[in-house]
């Protein structure tokens, strides 16, 4: 019974190790990562401000 429990525990650990993955080596050449997201947000913020301005103009015309 003890051997069977040990085998089951070993099997569970082996399956968990096979399913898990991680990057073990780190390099400074990864770039800036998520900090570059601001460049992609600029067009969206421009469109948002443009739509807001047009909505204000349209709401002023309906009165």
From Swiss-Prot:
Compartments, as annotated in UniProt: Secreted
Modified residues (Threonine amide): 32
Signal peptide (from-to): 1-22
Alphabetical keyword list: Amidation, Cleavage on pair of basic residues, Disulfide bond, Flight, Hormone, Neuropeptide, Pyrrolidone carboxylic acid, Secreted, Signal
GO molecular function: hormone activity
Any matching Pfam family: Adipokin_hormo
Residues where Pyrrolidone carboxylic acid is found: 23
Highest rank taxon of the organism: Eukaryota
GO cellular component terms given for this protein: extracellular region
Major localization listed first in the record, in broad terms: secreted
GO biological process: flight behavior; neuropeptide signaling pathway
InterPro entries linked: Adipokinetic_hormone_CS (IPR002047), AKH/RPCH_hormone (IPR010475)
UniProt similarity note: Belongs to the AKH/HRTH/RPCH family.
Function description: This hormone, released from cells in the corpora cardiaca, causes release of diglycerides from the fat body and stimulation of muscles to use these diglycerides as an energy source during energy-demanding processes.
Name assigned to this protein: Adipokinetic prohormone type 1
